């Protein structure tokens, strides 16, 4: 552990997402956050390469916690998406705050400053129905209370999804359904940080988004970047690297490491 705060992301081993893990780990470290990553608990060559790129080769002291869960291959995407809500099961107790985020959402500035003794939700003003996964923050102890966690990650996910897969018709919002229902009892304790909608892109203010890349760059504020997939491609990698260079002030050594990681990832695919 390097920092007192950690962001929780999740990924399976799809190249659309897994490639981004060292990049967002690097970015969150630059602004003072550690990373907790939820992922299916199965070994493979790509997994070992990506984790070693962070732990053994990164040009900074890594602070990465991996929490695994078990699921069928059929349910892997759904379990991965929802697993972020269950990090409080095993999160390092010394963390003052853990906050949910996305593995393909690159932080561009030190925007997030949630209090340890509060539940903080960012961007609820842009969502009529759900609490957004990006971003919700609380202490590990509070997350255990909110989510009624038992200490068994897989069992807790199983229990919730047994119910929510029946009552939710859209599986892509089940994670938000779970979060919204769980926070319903705490609405009087929540600190809301409004994000506001950009007049340029209809996305949140400060968001660079892959679905409106040119328009969102008209934003003067920089908060986060929803990175283009596949991020390692010849078309998209220069875009991703440029956001890192322009917003996170990487050293030459760090840039070289990022470039080498991308090249090595392509070889191992």
Which role does the model predict for each range below?
Residues 22-30, 90, 177-185:
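Short, hydrophobic/amphipathic alpha-helical patches that form generic packing surfaces
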Residues 80-125:
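GT-A fold catalytic core of metal-dependent nucleotide-sugar glycosyltransferases
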Residues 144-266:
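Catalytic core and acceptor-binding pocket of nucleotide-sugar-dependent glycosyltransferases
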Residues 78-85, 172-177:
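Conserved glycosyltransferase catalytic-site signature
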Residues 1-73, 256, 264-269:
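N-terminal anchoring/stem segment of glycosyltransferases
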Residues 13-15, 42-44, 71-73, 104-107, ...:
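Short, solvent-exposed loop/turn segments at secondary-structure junctions
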Residues 117-143:
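Short beta-strand-to-loop element that shapes/binds the nucleotide-sugar donor at the catalytic cleft/hinge
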Residues 35, 98, 190-191:
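Hydrophobic anchor at the start of a short beta-strand
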């Amino acid at each position: 552990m390097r920092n007192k705060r950690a962001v929780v992301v999740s990924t399976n081993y799809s190249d659309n997402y897994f490639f981004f893990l060292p990049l967002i780990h690097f970015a969150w470290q630059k602004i003072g956050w550690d990373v907790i990553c939820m992922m299916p608990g199965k070994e493979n060559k790509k997994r070992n390469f990506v984790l070693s790129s962070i732990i053994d080769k990164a040009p900074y002291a890594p602070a990465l916690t991996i929490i695994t869960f078990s699921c069928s291959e059929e349910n892997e995407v759904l379990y991965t998406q929802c697993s972020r809500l269950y990090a409080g099961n095993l999160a390092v107790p010394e963390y003052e705050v853990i906050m949910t985020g996305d593995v393909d959402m690159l932080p561009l500035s030190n925007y997030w400053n949630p209090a340890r003794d509060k539940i903080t939700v960012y961007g609820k003003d842009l969502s009529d129905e759900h609490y957004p996964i990006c971003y919700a923050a609380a202490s590990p102890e509070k997350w255990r209370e909110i989510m009624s966690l038992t200490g068994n990650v897989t069992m807790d996910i199983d229990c919730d999804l047994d119910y929510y897969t029946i009552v939710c018709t859209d599986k892509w919002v089940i994670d938000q359904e779970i979060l919204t229902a769980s926070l319903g009892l705490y609405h009087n304790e929540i600190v809301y940080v409004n994000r506001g909608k950009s007049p340029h892109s209809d996305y949140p203010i400060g968001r660079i988004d892959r679905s409106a890349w040119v328009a969102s760059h008209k934003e003067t504020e920089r908060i986060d970047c929803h990175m283009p997939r596949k991020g390692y491609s010849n078309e998209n990698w220069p875009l991703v690297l440029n956001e890192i260079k322009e917003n996170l002030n990487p050293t030459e050594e760090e840039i070289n490491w990022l470039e080498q990681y991308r090249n090595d990832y392509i070889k191992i695919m």
